[in-house]
Amino acid sequence: MVRKKVDTRIRTLIENGVATNHRSFFVIVGDNGKDQVPNLHYILSKSIVKARPSVLWCYKEDLGFSKHKKKKMKLKEKSKSSGIDSVNQEDPFDVFISTTNIRYSYYSESHKILGNTFGMLVLQDFEAITPNLLARTIETVEGGGLIVLLLKTMDSLKQLYTMTMDVHTRFRSENSKGEVVCRFNERFLLSLGKSEQCLVMDDELNILPISSQSRSIEAKQQILETPEQVELREFKQQVKDTDIAGALIENTKTMDQATALLTFIDSISEKTLRSTVTLTAGRGRGKSAALGLAISAAVAFGYSNIFVSSPTPENLNTLFQFVFKGFDSMEYVEHVDYELVKSTNPEFHDAIIRVNIFRSHRQTIQYIQPQDYQKLGQAELVVIDEAAAIPLPLVKNLLGPYLVFMSSTINGYEGTGRSLSLKLIKQLREQSTVVSNSSNKALNSITGRMLREIELNEPIRYSARDPIERWLNELLCLDSTIAKSSPTGCPHPSACQLYYVNRDTLFSYHKASEAFLQKMVGLFVSSHYKNSPNDLLLMSDAPDHHLFVLLGPIDENNTTGLPEILCAVQVSLEGEIAKESILNSIKRGYQASGDLIPWTLTQQYQDEDFPRLSGVRIVRIATHPDYQKMGYGSKALELLTQYYQGEITNLDEVNQEEEEEDEEKVDQNKGSSKISTVKKDNASLLTEVIRPKSNIPPLLFKLSERKPEKLHYMGVSYGLTQQLYQFWSKSKYLPVYLRLTSNDITGEHTCIMLRELNNEQNNTICKDGWLQSFHQDFKKRFINLLGYEFRNFNSSIALNILYEKKVNNTVAVASSTTKNELTQNEMELLFSSYDLKRLESYSNNIVDYHVVIDLLPSLSKLYFTNKLKIEDISLIQSAILLALGLQHKTVDNLIGELNLASNQVLSLFNQTMRKINTELKQKQEKFIQDSMPKLSIVAPRTGQFKSFKGDIKETDMIPLAEDMESELEKGAEEVVNKLKHQLENDSSLSKYLVKGNDEDWSKALKPGSIPNSITIKRKSDENEETDKKENNKKSKTKNNNNNNNNNKKVNNQKSKK
């Protein structure tokens, strides 16, 4: 083996890192770079005075060598026995692998290394690295350690600009209109050259020109004690004699951690059980250790029921480790004063879930899952570790009438810390008075609960002001802070303009563009609950993403300062999916990456035409915290809508396009592009100089200077809250989808809203009114689901979703209302006659409201589907009807939700039922009236109508042939005759009928002709007389016949004789 002298700057950089407790970064370019890892590890081992540093080796799939130590030893023994191998022929890399504590990890399993500390990190397979992985792995390296990045052999480092990363496959979709541009890789490479603690070398340890900033590295003297360490030592000396606190603070590593522990002890000693202490910090600041020491202090103060919550008990290893360190400091003995209970669940890997203390009295430290918040009835102290990783509604449920400690990671790579700091802590701050460490106890909150906020800034794994940490925060914008508002005041929204951001310039690593990027990312981070470093890669490289910013009037005299960003918008182009892919999605369930809104709505509505439309999804919109609720967000949306509708045009657009075509032709002739990226010289890896691009275009473009894409709609997907829904609905967006399951982090349901664009240049693929049909179908499904998944919604949010403002598609709503009228068949199907009687009785306050509760679902659906049009129902009455009828809530639920008394709720509900009952009665009367047959009016054509032309209509006013009085008399006479006829036919009454008609009675009753006695004959007597007469006639005829027969017989006898 040929020995080669290593550049002294490499050894000096490693030794300086050990002396200052800072980390060092090395980039090795070449396929043999792994062979230099043992040399760097050897230099590090000689520089530190402790055991050999452990190594974390991360890779994608193939490690490139065997990591199996037993196989290596067998092969070595076999080669030695055959006499082939010798000590001189032993490979240094194999010796390094076999003698060093190395942990190998796939990039996909890098989450398992959280909480561990290593002395050296090796990263290979650069194409698989993402910003999340970069931050997650680098944070595990301790102070004085090394970070080694291995790159493959390349002729120029600028090949990284065009390298295809694995994550780029997620950015491409079927309808991508552009190619992926590796802007992040370029910015990453340029940042390495600027870092003073980084060296870029080839696989022979020759330092490349990109590290020209580190031409001369001077050796630094080891600092025995930093100012922070001196302050901590003096502080420990001061509290040494303090009971409990003195012993526990000895375990702290930084001054921030000691101050945080002291704040915890102050809250514990008060024993008010109405305080909340929040601890926020970046990763590696000692949050879990401070909580563990605080729990041991609570045990010393006599707290009996202590509960600890975390996403999983495995995350509490560090916390319980420092609980036991605190016990050791207070001279607690295991098995004598306390005992441990480990979990038998194999998923928890023997994690500690309970600690029983029985030194003075029985005390317990119990792990509890966030879902079991109902079991906290007897709690005195609840500790929530990594609260940002727990869904926000569960964290709220964990709060109660007891002392609460919670910690959360912010500005970290998990991307969940902002959810807690933005929402929960903000609510606690608003509901209570923040009590500082030096404040008086009399400064209590109105609600009887105090809030203390603690923040840890000083790292523990390495010393403060670590160059690698500063480089990583700048590269990934992890520590982006919001600039304070301008002292000149805020401009009126009408005076602001929306600008298009050129991403090539934004990520060019120029000083001005870097400052603008930090401002923009800080704006996004402060306004959204979930942020991760991968979002930065999406902003920079995704071909379908675009950025816009809203700026106030630009001062031309200000040539130094950057304009203040009032609002930032990130959008993504979606849609225009091929018909084959759509059919595969509908029939086979196939779904490509990207295109969130088209694929989601295709699955929900099974529509083949909508995914073929082109649209834009608003990924993020963030307003400056100092300028929120001033109209800037609405103004940005308004200008963005006008831009995509083609309302913002440029008169010189045609000329500009012709000029650009001419410039492209000239550039092609010259053989160079407009933006100079790669020089045409034959510079090698050892001689090339990497600098930012020159001749870059402007950072900001006016909307009139860029031609918009042809779009059919604009959409947004967000976590549903009442405030956000009102914001989007005010901008004329209609909801079309609401996810049934809530988000794991925020507990909010994802909502998709769309707005149709009126662009005359677009070819309409869907039928007219497609958005309104989606919205009506969504409302119908939402109404049916309010009693199930959406039952816990606040009635005001549900009412906002169902309430249509007049500005939203008034024509479509008006045309659809005629079809939504209640029909007679529907009414008979939904309500029986008994139902209507009960509703009538309740409206008249005769029965209780429980009698009509079963009618509420049907009545509510009719009202909210516009089949019962009642104009004078107020919003509060509609909310009560929705909550009781559709969400199946009780009156007790509405008392707290609407802040009304029970009698007020029932009174408003009764008024609503009265109005509904009146409307139903009117509907019923109308149905009866419509069911009656219509009489056709027939009038003869008399002389007075000779001038009339055409057929006589039913509505013509023609006089009848007979007046009403004569018609009534005829009718009465017919009725009397019918009654008489019925009486005459009745056998039981007919014998009592009096003889005589009207004329006979009038003659008999004449004055002066009335005799002293009157005999009245019955009709029955008359009938008897007539019967007798008829019988006599019959008997006479019979006798005559008999006589005639006798005479004939006599004559016959005589003739015979």
Curated annotation (Swiss-Prot):
Residues 654-675, 1001-1057 are annotated as: Disordered. Acetyl-CoA binds at residues 621-623, 628-634, 730. Keywords: Acyltransferase, ATP-binding, Nucleotide-binding, Nucleus, rRNA processing, Transferase, tRNA processing. ATP binds at residues 284-293, 461. Residues 1018-1033 have a biased composition (Basic and acidic residues). It is found in: Nucleus, Nucleolus. Pfam families: GNAT_acetyltr_2, NAT10_TcmA_helicase, TmcA_N, tRNA_bind_2. GO terms for molecular function: 18S rRNA cytidine N-acetyltransferase activity; ATP binding; tRNA binding; tRNA N4-acetyltransferase activity. GO terms for biological process: ribosomal small subunit biogenesis; rRNA acetylation involved in maturation of SSU-rRNA; tRNA acetylation; tRNA wobble cytosine modification. The keyword Hydrolase does not apply. Its EC number is 2.3.1.-. Belongs to the RNA cytidine acetyltransferase family. NAT10 subfamily. This is RNA cytidine acetyltransferase.
